[in-house]
């Protein structure tokens, strides 16, 4: 799904479709290594080094470590096109997947860090001054899950994710003392 989403987003971001799809397809490859299994904080970091040792281009390798960014509300963002595109599609894929099975954050619990993912998507778009058709990206992500015959428990996923993103956007604006009107 990440590979297909990255290809879809590449048109909006005007980046090389084939390269970003390669980056997406190897973005999680280090998660099955014993080292990352033992030291989860090395996810992405080791992926970058594994990719470099396998001869992948530096910008593709960097996207593996950078796509986990941002880690919080004020932390560093991915700044390179492959990195921020993989970061956006990874976070969209997670949001869509969890919303499809009705695993949404509540006022007191967010065990899958979906609020952080949503804020990350918005910060990446805003701070990198990107033009992304989020509605289209979310719709395409839902279709990819449907094609895999994933049991969909929530038929309102697209609307709910857009509302969820709007609420996170309100929070971002509030923190920056920008009026919502």
Where are these predicted regions, by residue range?
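Amphipathic alpha-helical "coupling" segments that flank catalytic cores
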Residues: 1-181
